[in-house]
């Protein structure tokens, strides 16, 4: 069973991947005239003013001299209004609509009608009627939004800060006056050492308590990871101390030595921990792929890889976590024969039939009624199989091994099942109808 945090992580990665695929598609669409509508509504804005604006735009479009352009613009505006009418109010995260006549590659023009609520709030409202769809503001939703906590600690005081994307924030800081080491011997030296130890302990306690106050919200960490930095042993002592909140200690991703305290030290700590911060982006991926590899190394039978076995596992409802490479190079074709019977086949991208006809190895001819990238089909259908979808990159060592060694598709099973470990790439095509 997955806990609430893991569930949220899966959903977030899926929605980011879905948006990334949509942006890629939109960026490859081109119109023959300025009839492609891009409409973005800020989550704080109301729908009515935009509906009124579109009605006004329809009136203005009647003045366009070219009959073809006038009709295309009017159709795009009408389609946009139809999409807008589906919403009584602006969704919690805002609304994104793209409508217009456009062509993709060498294919002919067709009307595209897309509406969606983004997976996180969009802060900009925008309207454009152009020969391209405008995705600049939508791309900002894909920017890194993870927040990392920083502690800069030395014998003079501590600074607590955070880094989120390109934003660096000082949250809190305080100074401390600790006794220096005592050079003389005798009883006074022993007493001074006790005082110094006590002051140091109190300082660690204050830092630990402030860490909890700053980096815990509603009993949960509010940062993705923590960097402990300083010019002495304080940072290491804190990390080993029982005073350090057990909810925060697992989040420490790096301990760095710096030459300065305060804000200069904060800047240096950010610079020295940049590699660690980049790696944290792949912690979730490393964890899930690592779990997949563990199942294989222990020979539990609770794993599957290769397209054929993975699809079979999905049909049986056995796949707990479906893992696919973000650039999975397969297409899913919907085929109709002369009896109007629809079947499905999956092809490697390079072997996907072109045109609108396909003849199989038995000489049976089919009409190709749909050609969808397999990754997009998984995005739309994975929940029907009762599975969680994990998008794997080849940026981490674990992800790279999964892509190169296991074909970029596999899963973790709920229970053991018999498999052949076959792969689509050894066949002409995989007939999904055997399983779906």
Swiss-Prot record:
<dbReference type="InterPro" id="IPR004403">
    <property type="entry name" value="Peptide_chain-rel_eRF1/aRF1"/>
</dbReference>
<dbReference type="InterPro" id="IPR005141">
    <property type="entry name" value="eRF1_2"/>
</dbReference>
<dbReference type="InterPro" id="IPR024049">
    <property type="entry name" value="eRF1_1_sf"/>
</dbReference>
<dbReference type="InterPro" id="IPR005140">
    <property type="entry name" value="eRF1_1_Pelota"/>
</dbReference>
<keyword id="KW-0648">Protein biosynthesis</keyword>
<dbReference type="GO" id="GO:0003747">
    <property type="term" value="F:translation release factor activity"/>
</dbReference>
<dbReference type="InterPro" id="IPR005142">
    <property type="entry name" value="eRF1_3"/>
</dbReference>
<comment type="subunit">
    <text>Heterodimer of two subunits, one of which binds GTP.</text>
</comment>
<comment type="function">
    <text>Directs the termination of nascent peptide synthesis (translation) in response to the termination codons UAA and possibly also UAG and UGA.</text>
</comment>
<comment type="similarity">
    <text>Belongs to the eukaryotic release factor 1 family.</text>
</comment>
<dbReference type="InterPro" id="IPR029064">
    <property type="entry name" value="Ribosomal_eL30-like_sf"/>
</dbReference>
<dbReference type="GO" id="GO:0005737">
    <property type="term" value="C:cytoplasm"/>
</dbReference>
<dbReference type="Pfam" id="PF03463">
    <property type="entry name" value="eRF1_1"/>
</dbReference>
<keyword id="KW-0963">Cytoplasm</keyword>
<dbReference type="Pfam" id="PF03465">
    <property type="entry name" value="eRF1_3"/>
</dbReference>
<dbReference type="InterPro" id="IPR042226">
    <property type="entry name" value="eFR1_2_sf"/>
</dbReference>
<protein>
    <recommendedName>
        <fullName>Eukaryotic peptide chain release factor subunit 1</fullName>
    </recommendedName>
</protein>
<dbReference type="Pfam" id="PF03464">
    <property type="entry name" value="eRF1_2"/>
</dbReference>
């Amino acid at each position: 069973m997955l806990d609430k945090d893991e569930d949220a992580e899966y959903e977030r990665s899926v929605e980011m991947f879905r948006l990334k695929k949509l942006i890629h598609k939109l960026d490859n669409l081109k119109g023959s005239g300025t009839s492609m509508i891009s409409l973005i509504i800020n989550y704080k804005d109301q729908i009515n003013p935009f509906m009124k604006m579109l009605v006004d735009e329809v009136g203005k479009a009647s003045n366009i001299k070219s009959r073809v352009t006038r009709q295309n613009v009017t159709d795009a505006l009408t389609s946009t209004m139809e999409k807008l009418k589906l919403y009584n109010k602006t969704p919690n995260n805002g609304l994104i609509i793209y409508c217009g006549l456009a062509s993709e590659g060498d294919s002919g023009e067709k009307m595209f009608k897309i509406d969606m609520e983004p997976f996180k709030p969009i802060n900009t409202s925008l309207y454009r009627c152009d020969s391209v769809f405008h995705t600049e503001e939508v791309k900002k939703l894909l920017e890194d939004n993870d927040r990392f906590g920083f502690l800069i600690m030395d014998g003079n005081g501590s600074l607590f800060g955070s880094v989120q994307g390109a934003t660096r924030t000082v949250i809190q800081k305080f100074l401390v006056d600790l006794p220096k080491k005592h050079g003389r011997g005798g009883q006074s030296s022993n007493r001074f050492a006790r005082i110094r130890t006590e002051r140091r302990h109190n300082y660690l306690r204050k830092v630990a308590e402030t860490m909890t106050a700053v980096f815990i919200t509603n009993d949960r960490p509010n940062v993705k990871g923590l960097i402990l930095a300083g010019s002495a042993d304080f940072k290491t002592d804190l990390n080993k101390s029982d005073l350090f909140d057990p909810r925060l200690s697992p989040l420490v991703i790096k301990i760095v030595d710096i030459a300065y305290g305060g804000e200069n030290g904060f800047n240096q700590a950010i610079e020295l921990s940049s590699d660690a911060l980049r790696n944290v982006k792949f912690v979730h991926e490393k964890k899930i792929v690592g779990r997949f590899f563990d199942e294989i190394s222990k020979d539990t039978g609770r794993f599957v890889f290769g397209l054929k076995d993975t699809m079979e596992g999905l049909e049986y409802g056995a796949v707990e976590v479906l893992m696919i490479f973000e650039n999975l190079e397969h297409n899913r074709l919907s085929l109709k024969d002369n009896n109007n019977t629809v079947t499905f086949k999956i092809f490697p991208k390079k072997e996907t039939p072109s045109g609108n006809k396909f003849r199989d190895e038995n000489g049976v001819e089919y009409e190709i009624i749909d050609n969808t990238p397999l990754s997009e089909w998984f995005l739309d259908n994975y929940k029907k199989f009762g599975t969680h979808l994990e998008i794997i990159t080849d940026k981490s060592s674990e992800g790279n091994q999964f892509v190169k060694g296991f074909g970029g598709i596999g899963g973790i099973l709920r229970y053991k099942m018999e498999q052949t470990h076959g792969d689509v790439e050894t066949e002409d095509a995989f007939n999904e109808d055997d399983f779906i």
